[in-house]
Design a protein with these regions (language model features):
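Histidine-dependent nucleotide/RNA phosphoesterase domain, centered on the 2H-phosphoesterase fold
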Residues: 1-180
Length: 180
């Protein structure tokens, strides 16, 4: 079971970002030069765990709950104001130009808890982002209107990644509140 921790986006934020993306990068999908991520798949990955057996997933969920009981993490507000392109991965993304410390703390904690139960060991630095396009062969021109979205998160989730006939979909396995 491929799992990861993430911040989900509210439907209104998904709609706003989709409208901006479609207006800003109209021609990007022509000729298969890029594949847009379905709005329902927009999220911010906090920590990718990879394939984790169900019994280990249960242990992981218990440890996350215990960790939050002992040291709660505050709700997270983000200003999504930066557009980026990772050429090697072919990913066009949106993210905050400044990552709040509580978000970095949450991502680091989840990564550490996951590694203790056999989750994927990842040495990459955390970079909060929402993937807009995959398989983007060339960097797109800058948008006419810069991104500027406000996101507020009161919880985070553990998602399962499922590959189907229509591509990838994500299913919520568990949800944890952040403290107000």
């Amino acid at each position: 079971m491929r799992i990861f921790f993430a911040l989900e986006l509210m439907p209104s934020a998904m709609l706003e970002i989709t409208t901006w993306r479609d207006r800003s990068f109209r021609g990007l999908t022509a000729g298969g030069t890029a594949h847009p991520v379905p709005p329902g798949n927009f999220h911010i990955t906090l920590a990718f765990m990879g394939d984790v057996a169900e019994h280990k997933r249960e242990v992981l969920c218990d440890r996350v709950s215990q960790s939050l009981d002992q040291a709660p993490i505050e709700t997270v507000s983000l200003t999504i104001d930066e557009l980026g392109y990772w050429q090697r991965q072919g990913i066009l993304w949106l993210g905050p130009s400044r990552c709040p410390p509580e978000l970095q703390q949450l991502a680091n904690r989840l990564k550490g808890l996951g590694s203790r139960v056999g989750g994927k060991q990842d040495n990459k630095l955390f970079r909060a982002h929402i993937t807009l396009f995959r398989r983007c062969k060339l960097p797109p021109p800058p948008p006419l209107e810069p991104p500027d979205f406000s996101l507020h998160h009161r919880d985070f989730v553990l998602l399962e990644s499922c590959q189907g006939k229509r591509g990838v979909s994500y299913h919520t396995l568990q949800r944890w509140p952040l403290s107000a």
